[in-house]
Amino acid sequence: LAVEHSNVHQQKHFTTRAFDSLICIIAPASFIELAEATLIGWRFVEQKSSLAKSDIIVAYRDNLFHVDSTVLDNPKVVDDLLDALNEFFLCLSYLLANKTQEFSLLHCASYTEAGKNIILLGDKKSGKSAKTLSKTIAGELIYADDLLLWHAKRGIFVALGLPLRLRRTMIPLIDSDTVKDKFIIGKNILYSHQNFFNNAKLGDEFLLDQLKLMSENFDFAIKDIPVYKTLFYLKQHLIAGNFISIKNILQK
């Protein structure tokens, strides 16, 4: 997704609040507008005065996007707007898990199927996104296609309000041009527009009815996980603590 250099890249100060946790952001207003057009249930408020601290900084210079955060070891530098948005969403998710403390972050897809709440586990590129896409097109409620919050003590799962993300190589799986028009297409990935699909918003809670696992053979086969093995498999797919830990203080 090409971006022309202009004043739209001037950085401004924003805050967003989720689960009583405040996240402070410095970023171009146009970038935040795009985030708001794809995220579900998030609200960003521009601050008239400079923030005393920041959790995420997004900058555009030398034709590159620079995304830095207190949860990153080093800034992420990419040349495509949607790739930058992807890094931004990851930082939001990691920060939310860090700031709330009560949630773990689960790598999974999650959706409804025949009235049941499903969580689908699997390795990267095992077929979770393809399965989620088929459920999306079928009109099912999508809780997550990559990351989900888990409150183990309460036994509930909570949506992050992230849009559907697809690799560009998955475009051939979308037969309908009408469906394609509901995605923002970047150099490497696609993001769904807000409100075009039945995506759960930030904070939507649900109980698990069935845990499923993609085949390790990458043949798109799916098996049901018995109840007594649920906890074991969930723990195997948690995002490691080093991803959500605070690593540095950002310099404005």
Map each language-model feature to its residues:
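Conserved glycine(s) of the Walker
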Residues: 126-128
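Post-Walker A alpha-helix
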Residues: 131-132
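Long, basic/Gly/Ser/Thr-rich N-terminal segments
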Residues: 1-85
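Short, glycine/charge-rich beta-strand/loop segments that flank catalytic centers
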Residues: 50-63, 104-114, 149
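Glycine-rich, often acidic-flanked micro-motifs
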Residues: 1-14, 21-22, 28-37, 41, ...
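N-terminal pre-Walker A segment at the start of P-loop NTPase domains
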Residues: 82-105
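Short, solvent-exposed cationic patches
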Residues: 47, 99, 141
